[in-house]
Amino acid sequence: MKKILIALLVCFSFVTANAKDYSKYYQNLPVQMQQPTLPSIPDNHVSILECGGNGDGLTMNTQAFAKAISKLNKMGGGHLNVPAGIYLTGLISLKDNIDLHLEKNAIIVLSEDKNDHFKIDKTTGKKENRATPAINASKRKNISITGEGTIDGNGEWWRPVKRSKVSDVEWKEFQSMGGTLNEKGDIWYPFNLKHKPNVAENMDEQEKTRTHMIRFTSCENVLVQGVTLLNSPKFHIIPTRCKNVIIDGITVKCPWNAQNGDAIDISSCKDVLIVNNVIDAGDDGICMKGGAGAAGVAAGPCENINIQDNTVYHAHGGFVIGSEFSGGMKNIVVRNNTFQGTDTGLRFKSAVKRGGTSENIYIDHIYMTDIKDAAITFETTYFDNHVGAKKQTAPVKQEFLPNFQDIHMSDIYVRGCETGIEAHGAEGMVHDITIKNSNIFYTKEAKDIDATCKIQLENVRFESFAK
């Protein structure tokens, strides 16, 4: 009897992180999906203040976070509580069974000093070549970031800026930080800043060190819930090769012109739920990736992805597949989402050496207003126009071709877009696509679809202003 009581106490000492019933999102789906498993977090609590943390906006808290995580790890895991305050920090590396919990008015601010964001190579003793995502975990189980607080990525200290994307006043503000212009004088780099050191020998090499705000790699049972992610140096959150991921009720916001300012990117993950999020991003809103070439194939597909009840304001695309998806896309449901003011709504982009095959993609009840370009677009010659990029003119080996197929859309409602449906690609790259029971109000062109692209329309109504 005593042994049974002890076992019960152990069981009850674990709490499923912010337990919430997500079963409603798995009813009446067009494909069978496994509902993600929530992380199980022990009911232990450690405050960052207990471990030397200070939310005065001046004190570096990197060691305090590390100490708190180590303390919880020795206890078998638990909740790292961050109370109201401003906590300047470098890297935060989560371990098994740990919840990083930000209370209301708690703000984690990533240090402006780039040196604070590099790990040291244990073999060479030297700084690694690329910065580590500020909040990171690798091969961990049962991890979460929850609460009502904010994580501020201080991205302007990392990102290059194109002159064409800022006002005269903004351009002067960036130059007042110091920095370096390219030869043409139309791109500003945060290199040779007035108050912070460089981490590379030149601006191009330093740009290669820029990385994401949150990245979980090969992790299982992941929850990100309630927090605000602000102004990342690159992507805001990118789970990669993870299983059982839930992203629920977060807000993601960065300047509309933030270079590579993707909000939520999912890369080669399985069993993922993305719900109730609000996004205003500088690049893609909710994006599915699957790696490029052989590496993408090895990583595997994005599989069993459920995306519902999200709102995307500015973004290059509301929901996006690509550009790299050589590992494939399989069993994806996108339902009851709103896109307002995005460049494109539903965007499928890829290119030779980046492409893969899509299977069982179902999209329905999407509501769009004020879409700048095309409401629905397929692009198979995508060029990654990152800062300093140059288009390749030499012949490219025809491998890992895009194969957008088995994509089914219905109840798509659009009030305001330049082009309704746009599709370009060689024979066999865009086929077996259906769009049904939809209304699209456009301003320039209803359809711009190559003859090689096989898209079947049924009960799709196009309207525009009277001419």
Kindly give the residue locations of the regions a language model identified.
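Right-handed parallel beta-helix
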Residues: 104-105, 141-149, 220-230, 243-255, ...
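Conserved short loop/turn motifs at secondary-structure junctions
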Residues: 82-89, 263-265, 351-352
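Short glycine/acidic-rich loop motifs that flank beta-strands on beta-rich extracellular proteins
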Residues: 77, 91, 111-112, 154-158, ...
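Extracellular beta-rich repeat passengers
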Residues: 325, 336, 345-467
